[in-house]
Regions:
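An exposed, glycine/acidic-rich loop-and-rim segment of catalytic or binding clefts
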Residues: 2-236
Length: 236
C-alpha cells in the first residue's frame, strides 16, 4: 500500500567520545525504504519489494552502533578519502611524496584507520529532485593532513530514493590543493534477504578487470575473456 514519502530521524547511539549518532529512515512511499546513520554514512538497511511484493532487507549490517565502531568491517560505509589500497601507504604528487596512515599491513586501505567510514557526518534531508521521492545529504570536511593526505577536502554525498524504486548515490568533493580522491560505497548485498547468496546471477558489462598482486594491490587492467571474471552475460 502506498504512503506519503517521508524521512524520519532518531538517535542511534553515542560514540566513545560522547557524540550522538543519528539514524535517518527514508521511505519513498511506494515500498522502498532505506536506513542510514551519520557515523560513516553507513547504510544499515535497504528494504526492497521483489516481483511478488515481498519486502526484504537486502544489505548486510549490524544491529548496534558498537559493532560498527569496534569491529569496523566497512559494512555500508562511505569509503574515502581513497577507496581500495595504496601500495606502501605512500604516493607522489607534483614532485612531493606523502606518507599515509598504514592500516592494512604495509598499505593504506580505504583512507587509513580513520578514513571517512569512521567519521561522523553531518546529515540533513534536502528537497528531492524531479523523479526523486526523498533525499538525504551528508557532509564531511577532511582537514589537510588528515591520515596524511594533502589538501582540505569538502565532501557532499547524497542518498536519494526515486519514485521508480531506485536508490541513487551522488558524490561531490572540492579541495583547496591537489590531492587524491576516490570515493565509493561499501555495502554488501544479498537480494534474497537472508541465507546463501549462491543462487544469485551476476551480470557486469565490463570487458576488463583490475588484476591484483600480493597484498591485493592493483597491477594492471586485464581482459576478462577466458577468466573467472567474465560476467558479460549473467553467471551464477
Amino acid at each position: 500500500m502506498s504512503t506519503s514519502p517521508s524521512i524520519q530521524c532518531r538517535d542511534y547511539g553515542q560514540l566513545p567520545d560522547g557524540r550522538t549518532v543519528h539514524e535517518y529512515l527514508l521511505d519513498n512511499g511506494a515500498g522502498l525504504r532505506l536506513s542510514a546513520i551519520s557515523y560513516g554514512g553507513i547504510v544499515n538497511g535497504l528494504w526492497v519489494p521483489d516481483r511478488s511484493g515481498r519486502v526484504a532487507n537486502v544489505v548486510l549490517g549490524f544491529d548496534a552502533l558498537d559493532d560498527y565502531v569496534q569491529r569496523n568491517p566497512h559494512f555500508g560505509v562511505i569509503a574515502g578519502r581513497y577507496a581500495n589500497r595504496i601500495a606502501g601507504g605512500r604516493f607522489c604528487l607534483d614532485g612531493q611524496t606523502y606518507q599515509l596512515d598504514r592500516n592494512d599491513g604495509p598499505n593504506t586501505l580505504h583512507g587509513g584507520a580513520r578514513g571517512f567510514g569512521t567519521q561522523l557526518w553531518q546529515a540533513e534531508p534536502v528537497p528531492p529532485a524531479p523523479g526523486e521521492a526523498v533525499a538525504l545529504r551528508l557532509r564531511y570536511t577532511s582537514a589537510a593532513g588528515e591520515q596524511g593526505f594533502p589538501g582540505c577536502l569538502r565532501v557532499h554525498v547524497r542518498y536519494s530514493l526515486g519514485t521508480d524504486l531506485s536508490w541513487r548515490i551522488t558524490y561531490e568533493a572540492e579541495t583547496d590543493a591537489p590531492t587524491l580522491v576516490n570515493l565509493t560505497h561499501h555495502d554488501y548485498f544479498n537480494l534474497a534477504g537472508q541465507g546463501s547468496a549462491l543462487g544469485h546471477e551476476l551480470c557486469i558489462p565490463a570487458s576488463r578487470y583490475s588484476e591484483v598482486g600480493p597484498g591485493l594491490i592493483p597491477l594492471r587492467h586485464a581482459e576478462v575473456a577466458g577468466t573467472p571474471f567474465d560476467f558479460r552475460t549473467a553467471q551464477p
